[in-house]
Structures are given as C-alpha cells and as structure tokens.
Amino acid sequence: MYDVIIVGGGPAGATAALYAHREGLKSLLVDKAIFPRDKICGDALSGKTVRIMRELELIDGLEQLDGSDINRITFGSPSHSQFDIHLKDSQNPRHITKGYVIPRQIFDHYLFQKAHQICETREGFTVKAVSYTHLTLPTKSSG
C-alpha cells in the first residue's frame, strides 16, 4: 500500500516523490519510458529549479552533471542597445541564482535515480486508468 502514486517520472514526478519522502510518505513512481530517455526541450534550468535542487540537497550532484552554467542573461534590442544581468554576483544585494543548461536525458535520469533511491519505481509501465477504491483525506482541527 502506498500513500502516494505518482504517474510520470520526469522532473515534476521525481521531485514530487522526493518531497513525499521528506514528509514520510511511502510512494510509487511510474513512467511509461525507461530511463535514461530523451525529451525535446531547451534544456535550461531556471533559478527556481536551482532553488528546489538546493532545498532537496541535490545541487552538488547537479553541478557534476554534463552541462553548462548560465552566469549572465543579456537582453538586446533592434537598436543594438543591451542590458546584462549577472546571475552569480553574490556581492549584489539583488543576487540572482545562476542557472544551468543540462540535456534533459541527463537531468531527468539524475532526478529519477535520486527518486529510485528513496521510493519504489516502475519503468516501462503505462497507466491506462485510475480506480479509486479507498480515498482518505487528512483533516486538520480548526481549534
């Protein structure tokens, strides 16, 4: 019996499994693909993604993956004026976390492996339907 069944082992599903584990929930993570698998994507990881990786204590492993750092964003106009935002300048009081460009095949596999370490996973498993036989919702006392 599982507390949570997560359908889809990509970044959202694997991250959900990691958060469920932090809350003490027993989860099952299923995906129709077998990892590693490729996905068409721009491969950029935003500052929000990096924040979540830090929160889950996965940033050190993430930094070891084959990819590139994003340390600056440049905005340009048709008149050739430009504006740079430096993301890694911790001296700046408005410091913004740097980002990364990591191929989805690598990033998704990394997260799926981390989820596999803490929960049961099933690959090559297609969910055709969901049947609710017993559903319990936790309640909080208002007092």
Q: Model-predicted segments: where are they?
A:
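Glycine-rich FAD pyrophosphate-binding loop
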Residues: H21-C41
